[in-house]
Amino acid sequence: MNETDTLFAPASGFGRAAVAVIRISGPAAGGVLATLGGRLPTPRRLSLRSLRDPRDGTELDRALVAWFPGPDTYSGEDMAELHLHGGAAVRMRVLATLARLPGCRAAEPGAFTRRAVLNGRMDLAEAEAVADLIDAETEGQRRQALRQLDGALSRQVAAWRAEAIDCLAAAEAALDFADEGDVDDAGLDAALFDRAARLRDAVAATLRDGHRGERLREGFTVVLAGAPNSGKSTLLNALSRRDVAIVSDSPGTTRDAIEVRLDLGGLPVLLVDTAGLRETAEPIEAQGIVRTRARIDTADLVVALVPPGGAVPDLGPGCRPILIVRTKADLFAGSQPAGDSADVTVSAHTGAGMDDLLDAIQAAAEDGLGTGDALITRARHRAALEACVAHLDRVSGSAGGLPELAAEDLRLAVRALGEVAGHVGVEDVLDRLFSGFCIGK
């Protein structure tokens, strides 16, 4: 990949629209804009221009254009934007014209943000926050992504890393000048191990967050489980307010898990319909039941459905929190059978009890996701911080031992903290991250 090429890509959605934005970034961005529009406009102000094909002078569009000289831009490079009329023909003709200009090429997904990272405009954790903000579907996800984009994690990790570097410098000083009498080995060693232990405790405390950030980012998983014909698919359709699952009187209709995303009070909930739990000799249905068991084991909440005359299904050992729901309330008299232990009674057909069920799921999600802001939002962050704690733990345990070992573990702790913001080992992570971005970002 040539990082000195000038990139271009649509920065707005495809399809018919009022405006289509094309973003240009790289050393030739100003020249490209002048080639199409005749002259460079005043920086950072929209200007009306007639855009023309440089081959024959054909007018492409009358558009608003903007010129952003680097390095104070999103990508850290010279940038330009073309605000075209939103028709597909206009957009495609301008893109084709850009592709013919020397030094220009179409951008890959995430290419502009990749350059922002490489040019120091943001770090890796902040770039991940850009992706999370684009993918955010609920208010809670939006707030969390913006907090990360503002550098909440990056600032804290930078402070920890600075402390770890200070400890490493002290350890290396003790090694380098031990024979010169300028360093008080005993006093320094005691202070060093104490500082390393405090740093370890601070990072470890952050890790004890119940995985709130990752769960908010990925969604609180709620699995609907029960015997065949207990009303799982009907309930899924009612909760999602659309027909996403096939409903049939024939047992065993659902074989594969069906997922629906809900927004409950700003929290993302992933609702999963599963195959009915029963003993069966039918191999495909049996495989679906195995998958149901696996989803139950990893769920944040299991909604156990009990039809009239039925019993609470066997969910297996070690099941996650369970909400027992009596279904098909319209089929039996009274609000609830005597002695029933159900938490909620519902009828997907009449709507009775549905608000109570949604309230119960939302309460479980609020309890599971917590109310505090989380610093850690990705498994990559957690793995790096766990590695840091492990290295600092070894430093604390090496008091009185070889100082070379303590110095090496401090060096590895610094490296682990650097991985969060992308100070080390960034290329592979960039490739994985930006492959999931949209074109033009």
From Swiss-Prot:
GO biological process assignments: tRNA methylation; tRNA wobble uridine modification
Cofactor note (record): Binds 1 potassium ion per subunit.
Organism superkingdom: Bacteria
Residues that coordinate or bind (6S)-5-formyl-5,6,7,8-tetrahydrofolate: 23, 81, 121, 441
Residues binding Mg(2+), per UniProt: 233, 254
PROSITE patterns listed in its UniProt record: G_TRME (PS51709)
Cofactor(s) needed for function: K(+)
Enzyme class: hydrolase
Residues bound to GTP: 229-234, 248-254, 273-276
Gene3D superfamilies with a match to the protein in the record: P-loop containing nucleotide triphosphate hydrolases, Probable tRNA modification gtpase trme, domain 1, tRNA modification GTPase MnmE domain 2
EC number in record: 3.6.-.-
Domain TrmE-type G: 219-366
Predominant location: cytoplasm
Subcellular location, record wording: Cytoplasm
Keyword Chloroplast (UniProt): no
GO MF annotation terms: GTP binding; GTPase activity; metal ion binding
Family: Belongs to the TRAFAC class TrmE-Era-EngA-EngB-Septin-like GTPase superfamily. TrmE GTPase family.
Subunit structure, as described in the record: Homodimer. Heterotetramer of two MnmE and two MnmG subunits.
Function: Exhibits a very high intrinsic GTPase hydrolysis rate. Involved in the addition of a carboxymethylaminomethyl (cmnm) group at the wobble position (U34) of certain tRNAs, forming tRNA-cmnm(5)s(2)U34.
Protein name: tRNA modification GTPase MnmE
UniProt source species: Methylobacterium radiotolerans (strain ATCC 27329 / DSM 1819 / JCM 2831 / NBRC 15690 / NCIMB 10815 / 0-1)
Gene this protein is translated from: mnmE
